């Protein structure tokens, strides 16, 4: 059974506002070295080269862009970029539950890639049930977006503490990569994501992810980044920017 998807005007407005944040950005490669500490030196493919996002516009330009988007949408201009977290630029996109938020943020991801070349995205959700629902939504819209974006291919990765090669692939692949994780997977020092791991030659999964400077999308933020510990955990992802 095929499902027909239609983009509604308010969804387009939300996508356009998010994309406008980076106006002036040009497509730039951002490669980094993934150190292989294994004696055999066989853990990493492609000579241990990681691929990430690189924002080149400065804070002043970004704030001008944000103010432009706010004025276009009848919102009072902000005087800073940081919202409830001072560690990285963060922006609120207000949409009610049931209005197609997952559809909107996937379309936003693809627009950010099309216009600016961004490749790495992390979606943080409050629970396993929501994580599975988000993954299902992302899967069933793949064909629709493939047609909308000239055959675009993107990789979906649900963080699994038992399959840490996913974190390595996320950091090293030169493709659009979308990781979906719960906040509980990385908000404590004892979490697998925050521990040195032999599967990754002694590296911590979160360090590989942070090297990519992902754009972070926080789903149901009232239940995700509502504590200081959660905010610190998200900051440890080293985001280029966040949408919530």
List the predicted regions and their residue ranges:
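RecA-like P-loop NTPase motor core of helicase/translocase proteins
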Residues: 1-244
């Amino acid at each position: 059974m095929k499902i027909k998807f239609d983009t509604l005007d308010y969804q387009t407005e939300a996508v356009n506002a998010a994309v406008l944040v980076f106006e002036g950005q040009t497509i730039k490669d951002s490669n980094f070295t993934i150190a292989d500490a294994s004696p055999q030196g066989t853990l990493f493919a492609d000579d241990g080269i990681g691929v990430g996002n690189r924002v080149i516009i400065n804070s002043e330009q970004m704030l001008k862009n944000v103010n432009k988007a706010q004025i276009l949408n009848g919102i009072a201009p902000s005087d800073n970029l940081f919202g409830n977290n001072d560690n990285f630029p963060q922006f609120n996109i207000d949409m009610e539950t049931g209005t197609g938020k997952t559809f909107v943020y996937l379309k936003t991801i693809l627009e950010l890639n099309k216009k600016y070349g961004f490749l790495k995205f992390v979606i943080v959700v409050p629970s396993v049930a929501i994580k599975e629902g988000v993954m299902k939504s992302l899967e069933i819209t793949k064909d629709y977006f493939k047609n909308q974006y000239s055959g675009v291919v993107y990789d979906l990765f649900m963080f699994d503490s038992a399959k840490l090669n996913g974190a390595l692939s996320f950091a090293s692949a030169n493709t659009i990569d979308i990781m979906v994780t719960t906040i509980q997977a990385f908000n404590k020092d004892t979490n697998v994501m925050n521990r040195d791991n032999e599967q990754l030659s002694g590296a911590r999964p979160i360090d590989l992810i942070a090297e990519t400077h992902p754009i972070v999308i926080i789903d149901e933020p009232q239940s995700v980044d509502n504590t200081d510990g959660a905010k610190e955990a998200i900051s440890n992802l080293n985001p280029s920017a966040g949408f919530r």
